Amino acid sequence: MIPVTEFRQFSEQQPAFRVLKPWWDVFTDYLSVAMLMIGVFGCTLQVMQDKIICLPKRVQPAQNHSSLSNVSQAVASTTPLPPPKPSPANPITVEMKGLKTDLDLQQYSFINQMCYERALHWYAKYFPYLVLIHTLVFMLCSNFWFKFPGSSSKIEHFISILGKCFDSPWTTRALSEVSGEDSEEKDNRKNNMNRSNTIQSGPEDSLVNSQSLKSIPEKFVVDKSTAGALDKKEGEQAKALFEKVKKFRLHVEEGDILYAMYVRQTVLKVIKFLIIIAYNSALVSKVQFTVDCNVDIQDMTGYKNFSCNHTMAHLFSKLSFCYLCFVSIYGLTCLYTLYWLFYRSLREYSFEYVRQETGIDDIPDVKNDFAFMLHMIDQYDPLYSKRFAVFLSEVSENKLKQLNLNNEWTPDKLRQKLQTNAHNRLELPLIMLSGLPDTVFEITELQSLKLEIIKNVMIPATIAQLDNLQELSLHQCSVKIHSAALSFLKENLKVLSVKFDDMRELPPWMYGLRNLEELYLVGSLSHDISRNVTLESLRDLKSLKILSIKSNVSKIPQAVVDVSSHLQKMCIHNDGTKLVMLNNLKKMTNLTELELVHCDLERIPHAVFSLLSLQELDLKENNLKSIEEIVSFQHLRKLTVLKLWHNSITYIPEHIKKLTSLERLSFSHNKIEVLPSHLFLCNKIRYLDLSYNDIRFIPPEIGVLQSLQYFSITCNKVESLPDELYFCKKLKTLKIGKNSLSVLSPKIGNLLFLSYLDVKGNHFEILPPELGDCRALKRAGLVVEDALFETLPSDVREQMKTE
């Protein structure tokens, strides 16, 4: 047998060269191996088995005057005689007789060899060797530019520098402080996300240069998983690498030998492919199983005409067709390579995409062989080119700014700015800084990070050190994120608030925060072409429960509908823009809270009545005048909170009585004049706000509200309070200020749980001493004119002043 490994040297190359082998070269290499196996297999059969087997022909040449007996003998020699009829008395005996040629083994071998050389077509004889030779030529052509001294030296030098650039600690560490790493592109860049953080910093690696290394050799490292700082030795190595890249660029950009070499070897392969297809297609039919052999060796063998069998004809025929298929695929691949070589401008390489990704504009474009090698590397993995771009960029100023920022904002100084936000989380607000200090990620107790008006923010991998971080606020910030940081936020971030003015300030990575529970968006989502900011699908936010949009949309965005199945609370603050299309609300079957604020609604949307799980509805600051549709709320059995405040409602329909499950009701800031007694049939109400209306009279039926704890009638025209109000023994807050009241009933002493009382702005001349019976009422909870407070007995005043 012929071992295939013996031919490995024809295609063997350094493993590092694989980065310059695009997919088509790898594919043709595999095709070459397959064709090589066909050739080796055919050659092995040629060596191991008989090539041809011949037998002499007994038929004499035909003559014009042949006798009938000669013809009969010829027929007899080719036609077997019928067996004799057996005698019925004797047993049947058959004697097997062959045709005797009186030839010995040596003569047969001689005949076989002569017929093989003289009669067998050359294509059938040399087919496996042709396959082997053609394949070796293909393999040599594919790898010639790796072997030729003029090109291999440049390739080896480039691969050496490329590997050092890719693995340089500076590439990973220093760049994370200067630029923001782009969140990984869709698509797809999962191989990059599986790499170490060294690889992940690829796009933003474009931000450093040798001057950065020279001036700041010991910069704090963002990725603490590898090391704490960039030491002096690593800085010197990176500095030397910058110099190598500069010199290599000057040297390689001068010529285009690599491009010319690759084009020529590809053209040669295409020409060879056409030749192989042409002659193989024409000669494949010459591979025949039966071969007639006429050689003048009668004086040595006694025969001149022979009938031969080419033993491997059938197999060679199949192998030839298989070989033609492989060569065809190989040739088509080479044609595609030529198309790629001539269609693409491979002598120029633009880093425009990297510049856009990183926001660094000083990465220069390259040309000639340098550009060609970068194009080839992009076919292997574009990440190499992006990381290599680091050492073509000048960003020492940005590096210095980052260092100064870290020195200015020490961890102790940042801790002094910590405060508790509205969500009761420990928050660090940073406003109008030149960047994001790395020292922020040393404050491990941080729960909420608020960034305002900070451009080109980079969230590095070290955000993973903030184990308690659950909330992130980005107000007018253009933010990029390290992939490792994105992975951390996907697992830990619960609340995200984004205030944006344009698309750049709306982070694209937020759509992948699978554990995000609350999302607050503030910004214009208009369909103006000049400022077209749209939401992408939120379907990946599987845990999203609360969504708040403060914008100017005319309909509910489709992105919101994508999370309708698990959304529990939705708030739309529309800044006065009319919200007209609300049919998508019907899809939010699990919605429990809905706020439609300042949406210019004139009627209560009918789609709301389909939300059977709804518990709270807020229609603040709309243009509601009539609420007759309120009767449909009776189907919403779980509705407990209804806020129709800041509208233009003039009356409350009697259908309100059917909303027996209501516990909180707000009609403040409307134009209501008459308070219907039916309202108080909603006897579960605990919170009732009727402030800032034109109400003059409170029906005595208010005493039915035995669960009432909060009642506000502030800024109305009420002249007296019914005594039944004081039957609401659970009342804790009573606001009756800015009315026309002149007397406060002594029965107010029955409200033992009263802790807040506002009576300021009325016509009282004296306060009843029974206020002393309200033990929970203190001076801080009593809103009244100082002079009126002095009308209380001294012991009552002292009691209220006592904490």
Swiss-Prot record:
Residues in LRR repeats = 397-420, 421-443, 446-466, 467-488, 490-513, 515-537, 541-563, 565-587, 588-611, 613-635, 636-659, 660-682, 684-705, 706-728, 730-751, 753-774, 776-799
For the region Disordered, what residue ranges are annotated?
177-209
Q: How does it sit in the membrane?
A: Multi-pass membrane protein
Recorded hits in SUPFAM superfamilies, A to Z, give: L domain-like (SSF52058)
Phenotype upon changing T44C: Alters channel anion selectivity
Residue ranges annotated as transmembrane are 23-47, 125-144, 263-284, 315-339
Where in the cell does this protein reside? Cell membrane; Endoplasmic reticulum membrane
Query: Residue ranges, Extracellular compartment?
Result: 48-124, 285-314
List UniProt keywords, sorted A-Z.
Cell membrane, Disease variant, Disulfide bond, Dwarfism, Endoplasmic reticulum, Glycoprotein, Intellectual disability, Ion channel, Ion transport, Leucine-rich repeat, Membrane, Phosphoprotein, Repeat, Transmembrane, Transmembrane helix, Transport
Which positions carry Phosphoserine? S212, S215
Instruction: Give one GO term, molecular function aspect.
Output: volume-sensitive anion channel activity
Positions on the Cytoplasmic side per record topology: 1-22, 145-262, 340-803
UniProt effect for mutating E6C: Decreased amplitudes of swelling-activated current
Record InterPro entries: Leu-rich_rpt, Leu-rich_rpt_typical-subtyp, LRR_dom_sf, LRR_domain-containing, LRRC8_Pannexin-like
- The annotated regions of Polar residues compositional bias extend over 191-209
**Which reaction(s) are listed as its catalytic activity?**
chloride(in) = chloride(out); iodide(out) = iodide(in); taurine(out) = taurine(in); 2',3'-cGAMP(out) = 2',3'-cGAMP(in)
Q: Name one GO cellular component term.
A: membrane
Q: List the disulfide bonds.
A: C54-C308, C115-C293
Quick one: a GO biological-process term for this protein? Answer: cellular response to osmotic stress
Question: What is the reported tissue distribution?
Answer: Expressed at highest levels in skeletal muscle, and at moderate levels in heart, lung and peripheral blood leukocytes.
Glycosylation: which residues? N64, N70
Q: What does this protein do?
A: Non-essential component of the volume-regulated anion channel (VRAC, also named VSOAC channel), an anion channel required to maintain a constant cell volume in response to extracellular or intracellular osmotic changes. The VRAC channel conducts iodide better than chloride and can also conduct organic osmolytes like taurine. Plays a redundant role in the efflux of amino acids, such as aspartate and glutamate, in response to osmotic stress.
The record names the disease as: Telangiectasia, impaired intellectual development, microcephaly, metaphyseal dysplasia, eye abnormalities, and short stature: An autosomal dominant, pleiotropic disorder characterized by variable features that include telangiectasia, gastrointestinal vascular dysplasia, intellectual disability, skeletal dysplasia with fragile bones, short stature, and eye abnormalities. Patients exhibit striking cutis marmorata in infancy.
Query: In which family does this protein belong, per the annotation?
Result: Belongs to the LRRC8 family.
Oligomeric and partner information: Heterohexamer; oligomerizes with other LRRC8 proteins (LRRC8A, LRRC8B, LRRC8D and/or LRRC8E) to form a heterohexamer. Homoheptamer; inactive, likely because it is not targeted to the plasma membrane in the absence of LRRC8A. In vivo, the subunit composition may depend primarily on expression levels, and heterooligomeric channels containing various proportions of the different LRRC8 proteins may coexist.
Instruction: Kindly provide the name given to this protein in its UniProt entry.
Output: Volume-regulated anion channel subunit LRRC8C
Q: Which gene encodes it?
A: LRRC8C
